[in-house]
């Protein structure tokens, strides 16, 4: 454990940030899993609806630096291709 006041403060701030980041990452992954679940079920309408809900969340997390923008683009491209195959 830190002894210096500023190091103690940084430890507290880091733990707080870690919890927020973990929560946001979990939320994002949950929305992505919903799209995959709809694709697995073969329901194109549900998959498209889940994708439309997931897309702004992934974009927002990429903009905030939680994930890289290319990873967000890759998720969206792969899911779009899979949804289009359901036709």
From Swiss-Prot:
Keyword Ribonucleoprotein recorded: yes
Alphabetized InterPro entries for the sequence: Ribosomal_bS20, Ribosomal_bS20_sf
GO molecular function, one term: small ribosomal subunit rRNA binding
Gene Ontology annotations for the cellular component aspect, listed alphabetically: cytosol; small ribosomal subunit
Membrane-crossing segments per the record: none
GO biological process: translation
Family annotation (SUPFAM superfamilies): Ribosomal protein S20
Keywords of this entry: Ribonucleoprotein, Ribosomal protein, RNA-binding, rRNA-binding
The keyword Translocase is annotated on this UniProt entry: no
Family, per entry: Belongs to the bacterial ribosomal protein bS20 family.
Gene3D superfamilies: Ribosomal protein S20 (1.20.58.110)
Species the sequence originates in: Shigella flexneri serotype 5b (strain 8401)
Any Pfam family: Ribosomal_S20p
Protein's UniProt name: Small ribosomal subunit protein bS20
The protein's role, per its UniProt record: Binds directly to 16S ribosomal RNA.
